[in-house]
Swiss-Prot record:
Keyword annotations from UniProtKB, A to Z: Aminoacyl-tRNA synthetase, ATP-binding, Cytoplasm, Ligase, Nucleotide-binding, Protein biosynthesis, RNA-binding
The S4 RNA-binding domain, residue ranges: 353-420
Encoding gene per record: tyrS
Lineage: Bacteria, Bacillati, Bacillota, Bacilli, Bacillales
EC primary class: ligase
Organism name: Staphylococcus saprophyticus subsp. saprophyticus (strain ATCC 15305 / DSM 20229 / NCIMB 8711 / NCTC 7292 / S-41)
Descriptive protein name: Tyrosine--tRNA ligase
Compartment(s) of residence: Cytoplasm
Pfam families on file: SYY_C-terminal, tRNA-synt_1b
Subunit-level organization: Homodimer.
GO molecular function annotation: ATP binding; RNA binding; tyrosine-tRNA ligase activity
Catalytic activity, as annotated: tRNA(Tyr) + L-tyrosine + ATP = L-tyrosyl-tRNA(Tyr) + AMP + diphosphate + H(+)
PANTHER family xref list: TYROSINE--TRNA LIGASE, MITOCHONDRIAL, TYROSYL-TRNA SYNTHETASE
E.C. code: 6.1.1.1
């Protein structure tokens, strides 16, 4: 008997590996399954590189299964070597706790917690913190062979350059997590990124050895790779965070709206809850009228709404449309700063007033001759208003909040002029 959820995951390309394909299908067909996915609090916010495993877990919730969302307050004190070429810097306990609180809030955007079968947040510090060193070595270490651990890719790739005993034992801690959740909540499936395969199978093996549990499974999702081979989730400005204070909803929206034609359908399948028919219709539009960018708009709107809400999405669209149209007058100072964060920032002495001198001093035009031509030809805009008078003098009215002026040269070249 096929399972609708698994068929949907396969269609979306979300299944990379399964420890027991028929076993997972059987339990999903016969019962409401409790399953989990975890993240270590390495920062006080998740970024979009963390999203896919948790969105996949949410798909299980949409089909009636119960997610456990694990925040690694314990394992975060240690550091996962998976996918890392060098040792992590240990965080203080206070920093880890701050990070846990930040991520907890974000999980409430991704999962439903307040229903009868809602998700549950758990922190592995609650049980790992209770295990003494002697208990760890006797109760758990005795069941884990060194040769078995050395066979893990996450360990092997680090042996050449060195790995501390601290990180070497990480996989045992995550294995303990799976066992604890299995015995406490009857959790039978762990979901994770493809780099978590070794940690997931360690948990299944530890449960089998310690108390004969054979009904435990793992499912991993693929690494998100862009068509150009570049790392997903990074911009020139760094990571794209879920925290609006780190990455504004406008910047978040812009990240998704700028998805290439080659990636957009894959990302619609990965990151949205749109049905197959809706995505296929967007794919048809992409093939027949790519200039409309309907697929990109659907992606940006759905993901931004899911993470930041409708109001933030509306603001992001409004700012985007105003900037595209050059309608700067309709935006507040904070929205302008947000929208022009990545344009060249230039400084101007407050004494300089004449428009020609202004655009030469700031480097917007290369010479006074070029500056005069730019002004005369209508290529210069002050705060969105074309200025064609070479004798124009900037006044306090041209300073937004007495702090900056937006100058545009040509159709799209913007500069934020800050006053010394």
């Amino acid at each position: 008997m096929t399972n609708a959820l698994l068929e949907d995951l396969k269609w979306r390309g979300l299944i990379y590996q399964q420890t027991d394909e028929s076993g997972i299908e059987n339990i999903l067909n016969k019962e409401q399954v409790t399953l989990y996915c975890g993240a270590d609090p390495t920062a006080d916010s998740l970024h979009i590189g963390h999203l896919l495993p948790f969105l996949t877990l949410r798909r299980f919730q949409e089909h009636g299964h119960r997610p456990l969302v694990l925040i690694g307050g314990g394992t975060g004190m240690i550091g996962d070597p998976s996918g890392k070429s060098e040792e992590r810097t240990l965080q203080t306990e206070a920093q880890v706790e701050t990070n846990v609180q930040g991520i907890n809030k974000q999980m409430h955007k991704i999962f439903e917690f307040d229903t009868e079968k809602g998700a549950k947040l758990v922190n592995n510090k609650d049980w790992l913190g209770q295990i003494s060193l002697i208990d760890f070595l006797r109760d758990y270490g005795k069941h884990v062979g060194v040769n078995y651990m050395l066979g893990k890719d996450s360990i092997q790739t680090r042996l050449e350059h060195g790995i501390s005993y601290t990180e070497f034992t990480y996989t045992i801690l995550q294995a303990i997590d799976f066992g604890h959740l299995n015995r406490t909540y009857n959790c039978k499936v762990q979901v994770g990124g493809s780099d978590q395969w070794g940690n997931i199978t360690s948990g299944i093996e530890l449960m089998r050895r310690m108390y004969g549990q054979t009904e435990a499974y793992g499912l991993t999702i693929p690494l998100v790779v862009k068509s150009d081979g570049k790392k997903f989730g990074k911009t020139e400005g760094g990571a794209v965070w879920l925290d609006a204070a780190k990455t504004s909803p406008y910047e978040f929206y812009q990240f998704w709206i700028n998805t290439t034609d080659d990636d957009v359908i894959k990302f619609l399948k990965y990151f949205t809850f749109l049905e197959q028919e809706e995505i296929e219709a967007l794919e048809k539009s992409l093939n027949e009228a790519p200039h409309l960018r309907e697929a990109q708009k659907a992606l940006a709107e759905n993901v931004t709404r899911f993470i930041h809400g409708q109001d933030a999405l509306d603001d992001a669209i409004r700012i985007s449309q105003a900037l595209f149209a050059g309608d700067l007058q309709s935006l507040s100072a904070s929205e302008l700063k947000e929208g022009f964060k990545d344009v060249p920032q230039v400084e101007l002495s407050s004494e300089t007033r004449n428009i020609v001198e202004v655009i030469v001093e700031t480097g917007i035009s290369s010479s006074k001759r070029q500056a005069r031509e730019d002004v005369n030809n209508g290529a210069i805009y002050i705060n969105g208003i074309r200025q064609q008078d070479v004798n124009y003098e900037l006044t306090s009215e041209d300073k937004i909040e007495n702090e900056f002026t937006i100058i545009r040269r040509g159709k799209k070249k913007y500069f934020m002029v800050n006053y010394k």
